[in-house]
Structure formats: C-alpha cells, structure tokens
Amino acid sequence: PPPGSGIPPAAYADYIGKTSAIAPGYRYDSRNDPFDPSRGRRFNFSTTIAGGPLGGNFSYVKPVGAATSYFRTGRKSHFAVNMEGGFIRAYDGKEIPIFERFRIGGDRSVRGFQYGSIYPLDGDDKAFFTEQGALLGGDKYLVFNAELVRAIAGPLKLVLFFDAGNAWLEGQSFNPFKLRASTGAELRMFLPIFQAPLRFIYGINLAPKTIKGPDGSPLNGGAEKSSDFQFSIG
C-alpha cells in the first residue's frame, strides 16, 4: 500500500545492510572569521553517490547544497541570510534508506521546532509511514534562515531570527507558501575554549499544527508546541 494508508505508527524500523558511497564536493569560503563571521560568503555543495558499481545494499544519489552571506549593518551589528536544500533519488530498483531521508527542525535548521519534527504531510496534516510503521522523511527539502546579530557586551551577542523550511515526498509539489516558519531571539556567546559559540535559543512556531497518524488520531499527544527553548554549542 502507499505510505500512510492503514499503517499503524511506530517509532523506529530496523534496517540491516551496507552502504558503499562516495561524496565529492566543492566549498568556497570568504568569511572574515570561521567561528564568528560578520562579513563574507560561504558556499558548499556535495553529492553522495551510493551503490551501483560501488556495491552495497542501497543505491541512491543525494545532492545537497547551502549558501550563506554576511553583511555589516553597523559597527556592532551584521545581517546574515542562508539558504540550503537537497534531494535524494534511488536507482537500480532500490528504495531510499529511511535514515537518509530529510527531516528538519532544531537549532541547525528551523529554530523553534524540535529536532527532526518537520517532515512531509498530506493536505490533511497526516504524516506518512512505511509499511513497517516508521515515520517517513522527505525526498527533498528546503531551509531559509535570516538573522540580525548585535553585539551587546564582550563576547555576548543578541540574535533576532526568522527561519522557514519544509520537506516533501517525490510526488508532492514545492509550495513556498506552505513552509513551516518560526521567529525568535537567541543569545550567542563565543568562548575561545570551545572554538564555537554557546547558543541559548527561544523560538516561536508561527503556525502550530496538529499532526495526525494514518488513522487520523493526533501524533505526539496533540498539537505542536507553540514555542521551544534550545541550547546548542556551535
């Protein structure tokens, strides 16, 4: 049956197999500081090619790219914008490994959402599942981030942000007006001992949904949280 039709939900599915892959890529970086940038650009693109002549149990192609730009807006402030996306396609009659599918959300993608909580939904906000009952991630995804960063005192900075993104299955069309979105604030402190910033993030889900399972009952106990606090390093 197609994903999501009469399949009882389950948290995990077991996969046993070997992936043999190569991942050539390209990276460009002109940022003024690799850990705490305020101007410059960064671009990276890579394609993972698995299976086929490389062997293994899974055969797929997975290109992913991201571009980020930083602009000075004042002596103590800057603006940053980031866009990233990717897709995955299987070949040789193989299926896409469930652990290679895209699920976004969290401090590295769409803040204000719990990690991995954004995934494909149908028109009635039902999630999709495999025949084994595992939640399906997307065949493709897109993430957009914009933030204004202002130095407060010493290593402490205030960040105001807007994030948006979503993941879709292959048969679903991309709709820029149906991205999951959040806004909020972040305190960011760079400490040399970590070589990365400490991040205290408060994000607001701009349109909480009640995501449903195959039988129409709410997943995860009901509606999504309207806000979320996150801590991260890096």
Question: Over which residues does each language-model region extend?
Answer:
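Short Gly/Pro-enriched loop/turn and capping motifs at secondary-structure junctions
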Residues: 165-167, 192-194, 205-209
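Conserved active-site loop/cleft motifs that coordinate metal ions or position small ligands
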Residues: 158-161, 196-203
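C-terminal outer-membrane beta-barrel translocator/porin domains of Gram-negative envelope proteins
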Residues: 1-152, 160-164, 168-177, 211-224, ...
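Conserved short loop/turn motifs at secondary-structure junctions
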Residues: 50-51, 204-206
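Strand-loop-strand
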Residues: 170, 175-185, 189-195
